[in-house]
């Protein structure tokens, strides 16, 4: 009986093994193994026979198999087996974004630590290696599926302006695309830039529009990303990235009835995780990127990790992951997309056959595909495809077919299509290739990849971090464009706030004639969106193109100002009095942050006189969803002015002189000059959440009771008189010396003889913390590669700017004090108002060619090689200074701030404009101010950067003790601002808007709007409030984007007594829904029409519908 049981057990075990081995054979025909082992199928029957005679042989076979696997794993194979893949948990409640360190397969900061960054010649793939593949990897049941994707990259401004490109190139490309796609049903084409497509479509006749909709509907023409532009990812703010995406996708939905879910970013110079964050929350499923460091491409390719699930650095659950495809080679042009050998791939760019004026740099031209050569040409091309496929995990391969402004001529369409169709026909018909090739779209490729994933071919790794700073070869790091053309970068941030304010102010009401408001808002959104282009805000376009961007943004600023002042008058004038006049300017906007040139005389001066105009109404607007108290200033014609609210309650004010700085050619110094006709009045305004507050300025015949006057001290040798008109305090003079200043209960700041900050004392009983400001300059190399608009290639460490003994102006008042100094190329001002000091640099690099000016802060903070910079104003990421990389590689984009810290102290520099910066030594921060370069850096621009304009940079400096704060683990890749730093950043990017009433008397004026609005928690912001429907619609829809940042908790947590419910900000709500960030897809109908609370580091969108 025992023998029978043994025999029965043997039969059962043998049967199971037979089943498992059969399944193994079937699956092996369907999917390749991750390793390069070749199974010996001829021995399978012998093995089964042996198993039937006894299981004792099984153990020996398993030992042999393990030995073979060990041998394979020890081979010198550049492609290593994939790592274990972290699985994403289901979304749940709010994540702990501080204490829980996210677990991912690839963390970019850790990867940078491990990588050697050795630039080894890889052969035909210079930055890679000699790829080999198993010729038996594919079979009839497991073919290589190749999608050849025709595309044309159209820059909305670079060498030519938007309109020049459109007239010369883009309209011809799109016109021919319509014709050839309509006539050739198998042909496909993808398009990214909706700014161009919208321009083209609106010029079409009705029949052509119907044809266009037809080829979109049948999938021949596919829109990728669908943004207004393909945005820069380094300097852009996340709100502007979302703005241009919404603008483009809204147009596509309205006119084409499509919403892309696959993104295509082939040309931005480095990639930010902010992009997948916004895309994923806008309904995207997949994205593609190209420009990443060549060493990163090689490292990920070796691991077959070029396709991954890109997570946010705080995400420990996978809620934010977006599937991402990274292109493996040098460029997105045809020579670098079919495979690793550009000499071979160039032969399959049939526009380079000679008649088009293009050729292959490798001296082997393409040939027309014929019956005589199709076999040999197919062998050559399939070999490249299969080598490229080795870098990815599935049997699906993407082959982009295009370049800048391609497919312009009819003949180009024909020559590419006909030759590839001949290749496809031959390749697909030859069984030995085991390849199925066709024209396709990006979405078709991703669909096939995920189908292979579901079939069990592959699991994809998780990755977190960013892809800055980009290098395309050797030590050519693209960190110069973080600063190039800073005047226009500054303009971008000013316009960003104006668009937000104009949309918010106009969303509260709908009134007759609203169409004119809507037109101006659309104009402003589209011009700001256009500037997000990766040759716009980057400062990497030709001079006349930069001028065009500037003019467009100036018009956008005017459009916003028109909307804002009309809306303020509507909101603060009693309904019984209000009568709209859209051609009239009810208010003048006053902004000391702009113009970017810092020319103070361009600001409006309020003319007051007892007989002419004894008083003037001024209004402040707060775009933030909580009460704000902030100092504001105006220019007035008399120093004897008092301030009251509309109920005639006095407000404490301070008057100071208005100073301008001038070059003295004789003494070669920069010195101040006081105005004799205008003065600054400063007072603290209190403004409701997302609301308005009115104040009144009134002239007096003498010093008003509640107005104080600042004293002024000029520290210089050989003083001269400085008349200040009616100002009641004379200027005092003194020899250069160190000084200290404090306002109210704020910190005490100590300054050197040269007017530069030396130290900060946080409280009167605490020690001074050294914080030394310095100005330095970088030079350029005398030979070889040189710095230009894109590249930062310094000739060594920065050298000090010779300051000499500059003139220092000290202004001291109850509400505001300041120290100003005229330095070579910079008028540097430190302003104290009782909190974090404000730094203003009026930078004029003049004619200092091949010079890059930097501001450096030196402290005793023991920060080591760690510092933090922000990404697109959305998040802060940990950086590590790497000595194995050159100086320029350790420079990063600083869109809104950076900080260093040790166990006790943190120093944060917040910036009101995007620039480049770093921490090149422990305890240091530095940020570039401007760069003037005579040479082209050989990246296609064809010029240097010599069109510099004076620019006003504004910063806030926050020094604080953090020893009692809850901080992330040392292993966490994210950093978070404190409450004080967050508020300082908001004051830079979204200050109070200031309006001066244009008329002498305001009949029906109301003192406030928004006093009944709920005040949100300090970490929550209503980043977007926009009317989505035309004013004529019966049901009005308003969209909101809420963002909640995570603030580092220090001390007692803030109590939140009020909850912000955007669904009920406007009356008569009929419906409220949670949507994608672009407002185009409803995700959830909110029962009870109450918006749920937003989690830390989350962004959510809602649309409320209201009856008119």
Curated annotation (Swiss-Prot):
Cofactor: Zn(2+)
Protein's organism: Drosophila melanogaster (Fruit fly)
Listed name of the protein: Alpha-mannosidase 2
Stretches that traverse the bilayer: 10-30
Region feature (Disordered): 70-92
EC number: 3.2.1.114
Highest rank taxon of the organism: Eukaryota
Gene expressing this chain: alpha-Man-IIa
Record key words, sorted: Disulfide bond, Glycosidase, Golgi apparatus, Hydrolase, Membrane, Metal-binding, Signal-anchor, Transmembrane, Transmembrane helix, Zinc
């Amino acid at each position: 009986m025992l023998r029978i049981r043994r025999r029965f057990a043997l039969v059962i075990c043998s049967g199971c093994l037979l089943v498992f081995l059969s399944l193994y054979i079937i699956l092996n025909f369907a999917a390749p193994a991750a390793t390069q082992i070749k199974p010996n199928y001829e021995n399978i029957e012998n093995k089964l026979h042996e198993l039937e005679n006894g299981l004792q042989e099984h153990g020996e076979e398993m030992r042999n198999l393990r030995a073979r696997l060990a041998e394979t794993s020890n081979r010198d194979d550049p492609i290593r087996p994939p790592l274990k893949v972290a699985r994403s948990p289901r979304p749940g409640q709010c994540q702990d974004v501080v204490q829980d360190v996210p677990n991912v397969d690839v963390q970019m900061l850790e990867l940078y630590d491990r990588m050697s960054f050795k630039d080894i010649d890889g052969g035909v793939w210079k930055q890679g290696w000699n790829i080999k593949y198993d010729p038996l990897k594919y079979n009839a049941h497991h073919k290589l599926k190749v999608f050849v994707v025709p595309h044309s990259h159209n820059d909305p401004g670079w060498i030519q302006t938007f309109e020049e490109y459109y007239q010369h190139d883009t309209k011809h490309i799109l016109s021919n695309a319509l014709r050839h796609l309509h006539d050739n049903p198998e042909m496909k084409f993808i398009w990214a830039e909706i700014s161009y497509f919208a321009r083209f479509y609106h010029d079409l006749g009705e029949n052509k529009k119907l044809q266009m909709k037809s080829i979109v509907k049948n999938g021949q023409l596919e829109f990728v990303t669908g943004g207004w532009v393909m945005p820069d990812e380094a300097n852009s703010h996340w709100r502007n990235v979302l703005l241009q995406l919404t603008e483009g996708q809204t147009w596509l939905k309205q006119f084409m009835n499509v919403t892309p879910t696959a993104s295509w970013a082939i040309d931005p110079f480095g990639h930010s995780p902010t992009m997948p964050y916004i895309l994923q929350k806008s309904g995207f499923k997949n994205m593609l990127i190209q420009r990443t460091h060549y060493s990163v491409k090689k490292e990920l390719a070796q691991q077959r990790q070029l396709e991954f699930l890109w997570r946010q650095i705080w995400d420990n659950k996978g809620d934010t992951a977006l599937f991402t495809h990274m292109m493996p080679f040098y460029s997105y042009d045809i020579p670098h997309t079919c495979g690793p050998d550009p000499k071979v791939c160039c032969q399959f760019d049939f526009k380079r056959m000679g008649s088009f004026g293009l050729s292959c740099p490798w001296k082997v031209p393409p040939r027309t595909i014929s019956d005589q050569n199709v076999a040999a040409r197919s062998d050559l091309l399939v070999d490249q495809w299969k080598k490229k496929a080795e870098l990815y995990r599935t049997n699906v391969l993407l082959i982009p077919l295009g370049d800048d402004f391609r497919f312009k001529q009819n003949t180009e369409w024909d020559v590419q299509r006909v030759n590839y169709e001949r290749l496809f026909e031959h390749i697909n018909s030859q069984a030995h290739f085991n390849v199925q090739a066709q024209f396709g779209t990006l979405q078709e490729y991703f669909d096939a990849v995920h189908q292979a994933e579901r079939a069990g071919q592959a699991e994809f790794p998780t990755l977190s971090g960013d892809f800055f700073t980009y290098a395309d070869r050797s030590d050519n790091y693209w960190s110069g464009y973080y600063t190039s053309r800073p005047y226009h970068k500054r303009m971008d941030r000013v316009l960003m706030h104006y668009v937000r304010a104009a949309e918010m102010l106009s969303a509260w009401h709908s009134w007759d004639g609203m169409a004119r408001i809507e037109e101006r808002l659309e104009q402003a959104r589209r011009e700001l969106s256009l500037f997000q282009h990766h040759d716009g805000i980057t400062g990497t376009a030709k001079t006349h193109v930069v001028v065009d961007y500037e003019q467009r943004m100036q018009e956008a600023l005017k459009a916003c100002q028109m909307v804002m002042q009309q809306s303020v008058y509507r909101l603060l004038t009693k309904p019984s009095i209000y009568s709209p006049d859209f051609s009239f300017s009810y208010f003048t906007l006053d902004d000391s942050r702009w113009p970017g040139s810092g020319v103070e005389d361009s600001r409006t001066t309020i003319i007051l006189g007892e007989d002419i105009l004894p008083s003037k109404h001024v209004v402040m607007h707060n775009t933030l969803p909580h009460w704000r108290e902030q100092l504001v200033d105006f220019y007035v014609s008399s120093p004897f002015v008092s301030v009251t609210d509309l109920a005639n309650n006095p407000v404490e004010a301070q008057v100071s002189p208005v100073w301008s700085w001038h070059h003295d050619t004789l003494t070669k110094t920069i010195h101040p000059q006081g105005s004799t006709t205008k003065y600054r009045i400063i007072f603290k305004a209190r403004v409701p959440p997302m609301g308005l507050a009115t104040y009144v300025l009134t002239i007096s015949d003498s010093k008003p009771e509640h107005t104080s006057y600042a004293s002024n001290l000029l520290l210089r040798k050989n003083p001269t008189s400085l008349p200040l008109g009616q100002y009641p305090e004379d200027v005092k003079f003194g020899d250069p010396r160190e000084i200290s200043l404090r306002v109210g209960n704020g910190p005490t700041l100590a300054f050197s003889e040269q007017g530069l900050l030396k130290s900060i004392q946080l409280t009167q009983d605490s020690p001074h913390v050294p914080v030394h400001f310095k100005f330095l300059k970088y030079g350029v190399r005398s030979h070889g590669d040189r710095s230009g608009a894109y590249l930062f290639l310094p000739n060594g460490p920065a050298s000090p700017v010779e300051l000499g003994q500059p003139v220092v102006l000290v202004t001291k008042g109850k509400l505001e004090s300041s120290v100003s100094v005229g330095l070579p190329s910079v008028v540097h001002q430190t302003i104290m108002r009782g909190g974090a000091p404000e730094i203003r640099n009026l930078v004029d690099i003049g004619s200092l060619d091949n010079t890059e000016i930097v501001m450096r802060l030196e402290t005793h903070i023991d920060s080591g090689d760690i510092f933090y910079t922000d990404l697109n104003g959305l998040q802060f990421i940990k950086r590590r200074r790497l000595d194995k990389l050159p100086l320029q590689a350790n420079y990063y984009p600083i869109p809104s701030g950076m900080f260093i810290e040790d166990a006790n102290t943190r120093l944060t520099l917040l910036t009101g404009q995007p620039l480049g910066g770093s921490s090149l030594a422990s305890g240091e921060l530095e940020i570039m101010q401007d760069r003037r370069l005579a040479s082209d850096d050989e990246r296609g621009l064809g010029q240097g950067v010599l069109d510099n304009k004076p620019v006003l940079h504004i910063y806030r400096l926050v020094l604080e003790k953090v020893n009692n704060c809850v901080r992330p683990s040392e292993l966490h890749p994210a950093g978070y601002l404190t409450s004080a730093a967050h508020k300082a950043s908001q004051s830079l990017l979204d200050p109070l808007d200031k309006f001066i009433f244009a008329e002498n008397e305001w009949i029906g004026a109301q003192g406030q709007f928004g006093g009944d609005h709920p005040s949100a928690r300090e970490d929550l912001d209503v980043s977007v409030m926009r009317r989505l429907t035309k004013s004529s619609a019966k049901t009005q829809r308003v969209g909101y984007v809420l963002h909640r940042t995570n603030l580092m908790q220090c001390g007692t947590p803030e109590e939140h007594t009020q909850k912000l419910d955007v669904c009920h900000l406007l009356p008569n709500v009929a419906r409220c829904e949670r949507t994608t960030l672009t407002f185009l897809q409803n995700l959830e109908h909110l029962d009870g029409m109450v918006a749920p609370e937003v989690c830390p580091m989350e962004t959510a969108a809602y649309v409320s519908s209201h009856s008119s």
